[in-house]
């Protein structure tokens, strides 16, 4: 791919964003609850990436995802730190480094109970993220209709 002088690259200030500084086991341990807690931000970011077809136009949505994840893990630290630490430590020490939930059911249950009682956040049921769920975005529809085909975000109403 060639670049021209017309190409506008983001500045370092545009790219500056706090880092979600958690380990892989901690991220895996909180993944289900994080996905539900930051569902709106994740959907906005993925919709932007799909519609714009240019990651530079979605930097703010990406920052929102990072900030939401940081907020989630801070709340977990403040409310359920002991059960969460026990859970991710179990995942980290699971055999052969596979971080399987199968070996940590008791720790997982304790964390999920704490998240439900203290954070009012239930783990989504299996299949929740594969269900079709509508998202009403406040972002304007992109102006280039040749990028992704139809720009209708909602299916038309059926006359029955």
Predicted regions mapped to residue ranges:
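Mitochondrial intermembrane space
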Residues: 1-160
